[in-house]
């Protein structure tokens, strides 16, 4: 599924019945959240609120509200095809040189895709049709959603933040929520390990006391948005990955007030700076955990320029107890992660992050066990291989006869193949999401690994149980007469 920008993608969704235009007057204060939440839980379409109360700018919600729409946004026909995206990322992370002419021929499609990686720089762009500076910059004219009753203020949720550290050539793209402080100021909530925060930290070391340039794109094309939340290799820019997904180069334009490049087709661009040392208390906000988070201090982003399309659309979402849009994204991106893990750990059969576990706090792994202690090695690998899993609190490892995505199967393995003392690993003082108020210290907590695999010699002195399985002959015999028995309708 190919498209050029967000509007092109919305047209494709509308053709497929995956976009609902709402002409009723709907308030960005709480009402949009309730409507979007009910729609998402029902597996409904993306929503375009064309008449937000008090504003003349439409609001787009629930864009990635189903795994199928996430797949479409990544240029794929269905969710299963996301495995191919994962295979491509695994290849780019650790490319294998061709072993011969035949292997070279087989790899040609991947090499052809790589040709779409460089960005295309434009001198004029739709995102700069309207230019506002100084006192004309006014975020209160944008219908930023106030999502939950006890939220501190309206919250920008889908802002694609563009930064560049002083020691890096490529830009970093990240999604960080931004609390609106006033007409030209927001709070940039980025965690210390995220790319934008690391760029800022390095900038402060290299240029102490100097303002750090930042730009934020709202309403970028889906491939670029999804590239920012996908585990791309550190050597690959999110713009380059978006070009791979889209099948054509990502078009960018230089910002008016700094040297950063932003998606040319975006709806709205915020340009400005972060003053080192300028912090503000952020929150509380209802979050993907299903709770309001604690108040904490983060840098203030001052906006000097606001550029946009003439008829801009504001792209937004909400976060809350799963399922929400981030949880749906997690379900889809799970399919991308599996081939990346399998490239490093070929023994892994499947990997599953249940959305009820806040998309990353609990992982279930199934594997082909080959030796005593193998499950514990895989646990350690999951925690250390990708940054995305550094906050995963629980890792459950099962044999490949268990369906990682069937909780009944997993519970059976835990209760029949585990001794709690022998088969549980506990680690203290590890990185934990600061939103996890269950940890004893903000940002620091424990992890648990559960080895629910069959135990090998050396792991137990007991004779291990044999699973009960009916013979194939009897199964086939009953299959032939099952319908005639007329037992279950």
UniProtKB/Swiss-Prot annotation:
GO terms for cellular component: cytosol; plasma membrane. The active site is at residue 287. One of its GO terms (molecular function) is metal ion binding. Its cofactor is prenylated FMN; Mn(2+). It catalyses: a 4-hydroxy-3-(all-trans-polyprenyl)benzoate + H(+) = a 2-(all-trans-polyprenyl)phenol + CO2. It is a peripheral membrane protein. Prenylated FMN binds at residues 175-177, 189-191, 194-195. It is found in: Cell membrane. Mn(2+) binds at residues 172, 238. This is 3-octaprenyl-4-hydroxybenzoate carboxy-lyase. It comes from Proteus mirabilis (strain HI4320).
